[in-house]
Amino acid sequence: MPRIVILIVTLALLPLRVACQDDLLEMLDKEIKPKRIPVDATFKSTRVINCHSVERMQGGDLELHVAHRFGLLNSGFKQFYGLDESSSHVSLEAGITDWLEIGAGRATVDQYFNGFVKLSPIRQSKGKWAMPVTVSLLGEAMTTTKDYPDPSWVVDSIHRRSFCWQVLVARKFAPWLSLQLSPTWIHRNMVATPQDANRMFALGVGGRLKFTPRTALTCEYFWLKDRELLTGAPRYNPLTIGFDIETGSHVFQIFLTNSFNILEPGYITETTRSWKKKELHVGFNISRVFTVIKKKNKK
């Protein structure tokens, strides 16, 4: 009789034992499966140098970005080798979420006010469902408040506006090497002559070569399609070579460039100085990140 009871109890508990084993195997399977791991810090700043990078502020973070360009180095002692002349741009840029950033700023050249939205729908990742690149989309609008030389000109506000659209595609090939392609479309509502195109296309390429945990060499070049057709002074493709220094929440960039302008319609379509002629400017960027809204720790 006791043997029969033991047999019945064993048979009754057998499905429960099998179910527990299945649950344990399922938990182990989830732990063993590779996870999708995002690749961070393709660039250390939201800019390569002039151009926006694929990076954006994390949700709740605010960046103060200051960009400055001096005059021509070869201007001589009379203009103190470019220090007497300068252009600058100051902006505030906020992370709405980890994939959406907005920003607004003011540039001294042509007295531009600008605002932009940057969206990062695709992020480079490793592991399960790995992605080879990070893709960010940028839309920017700007308007000039400058006075035109002829007081008789009546320039409506719509004609003072310019726009820029960019598809930023970057890959971090190694901890010390990152590259970015930046197809760019620029539209200017008002141009110098009817022969000048309102809309122009440019292709940018940029890179970052890391030397130490806090220093890197950066480079950026833009090829402007049909620049030879623009009237006025000859245009040159902007080339910029810089050196980055990271100090905690600050990133400091110092560089040489043939472009005096800072916003896209300026440095891409209006660069009239050449590296071959040694017409170079010293510039620097400073970014400072503040955490405005702290994220809640997930339990």
Specify the residue positions occupied by each region the protein language model found.
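Positively charged n-region of N-terminal signal peptides that target proteins for export
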Residues: 1-5
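Intrinsically disordered, low-complexity regulatory regions of eukaryotic regulatory proteins
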Residues: 20-21, 218
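A contiguous binding-surface segment within folded domains or other stable secondary-structure elements
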Residues: 194-227
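Membrane-helix boundary/juxtamembrane motif in polytopic membrane proteins
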Residues: 196-198, 232-236
